[in-house]
């Protein structure tokens, strides 16, 4: 490779013909993608390659597979809420979900695991999920994503599965049912799915919007305060 420290030429110059410009830019992008697929751009990290691949997945999940996949929200590996749960660790949870899905799924359903963004530098479950999916003969039905927009995934999922993550409450906010496999503050009768996991895959699911509004109003009024561990919040005094 030559001509650039990044392994590809700079953006093509703009000419007077708009159509030719567009074609030239698209050809440049295609050349870059080809180099990525061949592993010829070492300056691009694995994360960048994953992002390119996942953007294509999102279109399918929001169209063809909308409301036909179950979203599994993974938590950080050392989350105390995981350590104190009914699961030994996150891999144990992953195995439990894949086994149940393989036994009870309907035709045309998919399972999507979403990695926790704060766990990106510490864990990667690619090989585990691939091995379990192959072992249980659901290899073509299981996806593992890292960087896709969580609210979009929640809105288009048939249901969300969590150990006890607060993602479950976000799922309810977006109108998507939640199956909580351990204890969570929002796991109350009439709000979350009160079914064993094996029964979830074939059940008719819905969110009681009135119940959600009542629980949300109570938590805002009695239980929650504005704050963040990660950034300052204007007006919160933090």
Segments (PLM) and residue ranges:
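Beta-sheet entry/capping signal
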Residues: 69-70, 108-110, 159-160, 177-178
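Short, glycine-/Ser/Thr-/acidic-enriched flexible segments
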Residues: 77, 118, 167, 185, ...
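Leloir-type glycosyltransferase catalytic cores
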Residues: 1-36, 190-238
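Catalytic donor nucleotide-activated moiety binding site of glycosyltransferases and closely related
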Residues: 102-144
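A nucleotide-sugar donor-handling region in carbohydrate enzymes
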Residues: 1-80, 86
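A donor-sugar binding/catalytic signature common to diverse glycosyltransferases
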Residues: 146-192
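Short catalytic/ligand-binding loop motif for oxyanion handling, primarily in non-cytosolic enzymes
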Residues: 79-82, 119-122, 170, 187-190
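Active-site donor-nucleotide binding/catalytic segment of nucleotide-sugar enzymes
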Residues: 63-95, 99-102, 108, 115-119
């Amino acid at each position: 490779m030559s001509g650039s420290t990044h392994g590809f030429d700079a953006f093509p110059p703009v000419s007077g013909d708009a159509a030719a410009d567009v074609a030239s830019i698209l050809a440049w992008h295609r050349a870059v993608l080809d180099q990525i697929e061949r592993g010829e751009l070492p300056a691009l990290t694995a994360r960048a390659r994953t992002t390119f691949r996942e953007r294509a997945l999102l279109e399918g999940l929001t169209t063809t597979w909308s409301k036909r996949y179950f979203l599994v929200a993974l938590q950080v590996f050392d989350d105390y809420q995981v350590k104190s749960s009914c699961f030994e660790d996150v891999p144990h949870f992953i195995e439990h979900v894949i086994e149940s899905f393989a036994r009870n799924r309907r035709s045309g359903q998919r399972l999507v695991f979403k990695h926790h963004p704060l766990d990106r530098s510490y864990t990667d479950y690619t090989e585990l999920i691939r091995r379990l999916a192959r072992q249980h003969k659901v290899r073509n039905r299981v996806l593992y994503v890292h960087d896709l927009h969580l609210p979009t995934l929640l809105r288009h999922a048939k249901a969300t599965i969590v150990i006890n993550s607060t993602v479950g409450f976000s799922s309810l906010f977006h109108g998507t049912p939640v199956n909580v496999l351990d204890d969570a503050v929002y796991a109350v009768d009439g709000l979350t799915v009160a079914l064993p996991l094996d029964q979830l895959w074939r059940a008719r699911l819905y969110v009681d919007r009135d119940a959600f509004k009542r629980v949300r109003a109570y938590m805002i009024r009695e239980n929650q305060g504005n704050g963040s561990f990660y950034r300052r919040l204007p007006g919160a005094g933090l």
